[in-house]
Design a protein with these regions (language model features):
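Conserved core of the sugar-phosphate nucleotidyltransferase
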Residues: 114-194
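Conserved alpha/beta core of the MobA/IspD/sugar-nucleotide pyrophosphorylase nucleotidyltransferase superfamily
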Residues: 1-3, 168-254
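Short catalytic helix/loop segments, enriched in acidic residues and glycine
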Residues: 20-35
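Phosphate- and divalent-cation-binding pockets in alpha/beta enzyme and binding domains
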Residues: 13, 59-62, 116, 184, ...
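Conserved N-terminal catalytic core of the sugar/cofactor nucleotidyltransferase
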Residues: 2-5, 31-103, 195, 253
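Conserved beta-loop-beta/alpha segment of the NTase-like Rossmann-fold superfamily
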Residues: 73-145
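A structural signal for short hydrophobic beta-strand segments in well-ordered beta-sheet cores
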Residues: 25, 147-149, 218
């Protein structure tokens, strides 16, 4: 399995923390967000990763070179997105659309997930096509990527931040593609990028469009831990989260 990590953005909503480094290189308990994502993939048998870079790409490349020199997996390639300042994340995926073949993941570069959560995503091989990893909670705010899905079947019916009716889950920023799912997504990305508004579109809008006329599935990981780093207040929560994960692994290894 291969993973595509979208890490081109600066993360300007984090203020001075990203003045001179991209969001994916912020450290949590001594390791960068990107390192932790790659560690999680490697632990779960994902052998290859493609990291889409943009803001201060030279720092990301240097971080990956250090991993490579230390013999740390997975095998990583980078693709530079020169349009990261003017195009949304659909532009990043457009540049790597040919990578959307076979079994692959698309992972937002600002999301941390537990290794057990990733194990569920990687092992969910019984569901071909496109599968959006979702969580559930009592209420959803305006910044959540909200989801409407069929409870019984798990089929996704709608996804977007502006959904108002029927919301019963949120996307955590991790998608899996199997069978023809990647090819369907790649074709839809290319169609959308040919429209006047293509560069302003989030890739999950394309997933929403696909769900209106074809099957898109969800994987409910409620109970597993994850965190998104978007705002300054998220950093403290993410730090506490990864410390807990690290301490649990250390205790298990002792």
């Amino acid at each position: 399995m291969k993973a595509i990590i979208l890490a081109a953005g600066q993360g300007s909503r984090l203020g001075h923390m990203t003045d001179d480094r991209p969001k994916c290189l912020i450290e949590f308990n001594g390791r960068s967000l990107l390192d932790r994502q790659l560690d999680t993939l490697d632990t779960n048998g994902v052998s290859e990763a493609v990291v889409v870079t943009g803001f201060h790409d030279e720092l990301v490349n240097a971080a990956i070179d250090r991993r490579r020199s230390a013999g740390q997996g997975p095998i990583v390639r980078t693709v530079f997105n020169p349009f990261y300042k003017v195009a949304d994340n659909l532009g990043s995926l457009f540049l790597v659309r040919d990578e959307l073949n076979g079994d692959c993941l698309v992972w937002n570069g600002d999301t941390l997930v537990s290794r057990s959560l990733m194990a569920k995503v990687v092992s969910n091989s019984g569901r071909d096509g496109i599968c959006v990893t979702i969580d559930r909670k009592d209420s959803y705010d305006e910044d959540d990527m909200k989801v409407v899905r069929d409870i019984d079947s798990g089929r996704l019916r709608a996804i977007g931040k502006r959904l108002a009716k029927g919301v019963n889950a949120e996307s955590i920023g991790l998608l899996a593609f199997r069978g023809d799912g990647g090819a369907r997504f790649a074709d839809a990305i290319e169609r959308e990028m040919r429209t006047p508004e293509g560069t302003t579109v989030w890739y999950l809008r394309v997933i929403h469009y696909l769900a209106q006329h074809s099957e898109v599935w969800t994987l409910d990981i409620s109970g597993d831990e994850w965190g998104e780093v978007d705002f300054p207040e998220d950093v403290e929560r993410a730090e506490a989260l990864v410390k807990r994960w690290d301490e649990a692994r250390e205790a298990k290894a002792a």
